[in-house]
């Protein structure tokens, strides 16, 4: 059975990692010196945090990396018992081979409970001579300050367009795909700097056709073209509520989009709208209110229709 492309084309070593050149340079220095502090990787999903941790372990340990590296997903195992059992049992044993220390990688560590984080802090202190921790999180503010102060913090930003394009073209060439310019632009738009999402969309589109086009990408990603969103917002802003609502329903039915997806795309269009700064502020407030109501369980169609109605009377 074929691997998902995100795993098939995951970089094996630090020099292969796409983007984040300054971060990779610092991690490479740790490998060369065989010495490093505890690390905290923060950033949005799909920007290379897990890949960097795995590549670091493989470069540091070589063939014995599996014996000296433990990966746990904290969103699945987020309680204090995991820290007291799995983490502590692995941390207290000596490294295999000539490795100076073991590495424990806690993915999504911002999901750990407060008690678990306090237990982790004590474990980090107790076994710091033979074990290093790499913590990965989306929201560093959810990591308690005592842990943050014990780590070197690396902030992974969304990947640049040129890095995404280069990697997508490389994968397309290896998979003998024809990647059209419109297809690339569409993947860049829907992925928003998330390499994992970009590769998944490319693989899904490739299952439909060997030629990846703009239309196919938006279909498989369940996203509307930016011009479809622009058309709806312009109709609403010009007071054409009925036509705007019809466009909204077409997006939800024809494209299978959720209200949240449409709201995010409308929000992304706000800076480009030909309205005053004051009107943009009021529009963002209305979008925020609509988002809150949808998250709380209100009917998506009613809330989005109300948003379109408000857009027609912006002051």
UniProtKB/Swiss-Prot annotation:
Pfam families found in the cross-reference section: AAA, RCF1-5-like_lid, Rep_fac_C
InterPro entries listed in its UniProt record: AAA+_ATPase (IPR003593), ATPase_AAA_core (IPR003959), DNA_pol3_clamp-load_cplx_C (IPR008921), DNA_Rep/Repair_Clamp_Loader (IPR050238), P-loop_NTPase (IPR027417), Rep_factor-C_ssu_arc (IPR023748), Rep_factorC_C (IPR013748), RFC_lid (IPR047854)
GO cellular component, one term: DNA replication factor C complex
Keywords: ATP-binding, DNA replication, Nucleotide-binding
Gene Ontology MF annotations: ATP binding; ATP hydrolysis activity; DNA binding; DNA clamp loader activity
Keyword Iron-sulfur recorded: no
Entry-linked HAMAP family: RfcS (MF_01509)
Complex formation: Heteromultimer composed of small subunits (RfcS) and large subunits (RfcL).
Name listed for the protein in its UniProt record: Replication factor C small subunit
Organism: Methanococcus maripaludis (strain C5 / ATCC BAA-1333)
Name of the gene this protein is made from: rfcS
